[in-house]
Amino acid sequence: MPSSALLCCLIFLARVAAGQHQGTQAKDSCIHFPDSLPHMLRELRAAFSNVKTFFQMNDQLDNSLLSQSLLEDFKGYLGCQALSEMIQFYLEEVMPKAEDHGPNIKEHVNSLGEKLKTLRLRLRRCHRFLPCENKSKAVEQVKSVFNKLQEKGVYKAMREFDIF
């Protein structure tokens, strides 16, 4: 066997072995996902506490953005999908607008966003443990109300982040 062919075979086998090792690592981290979730949620709450007062003081609306039906979706078979959609909603629609309230707020909102991204990544990586298939009507309702509130929606959504 020519040395270049042997080298190619060795490289191929090394990649296969590395891929299997990475797959095992991802699988192992997913096994521990339920145990690490409370810690991740505590980190999110701690990050949110840095901006909570600001957004609560600036939310002048009496209505609630997050509804009982969303809570029911979180608890039901749509739980993972509703959570995934809400994370995407906050990362793509709420937080970019929330960052526009000064450099100090932006720093804390960015930190909160990074923790949400980490949670979203873990949810995606461990999707076998949490089926995410159907769209949540409650999340669609939240998005609709948020858009109707226009610039006041960001205060409402950020104020209610801890409910989410």
Curated annotation (Swiss-Prot):
Upper lineage: Eukaryota, Metazoa, Chordata, Craniata, Vertebrata
UniProt subunit comment: Homodimer. Interacts with IL10RA and IL10RB.
Keywords, in A-Z order: Cytokine, Disulfide bond, Glycoprotein, Secreted, Signal
Highest taxon above the source species: Eukaryota
One GO term describing the cellular component: extracellular space
Main location: secreted
Cellular localisation: Secreted
InterPro entries listed in its UniProt record: 4_helix_cytokine-like_core, IL-10, IL-10/19/20/24/26, IL-10_CS
GO biological process: one example: immune response
Stored PANTHER family: INTERLEUKIN-10, INTERLEUKIN-19-RELATED
Disulfide topology: C30-C126, C80-C132
SMART domains: IL10 (SM00188)
Protein name: Interleukin-10
Signal peptide: 1-18
Any GO molecular function: cytokine activity
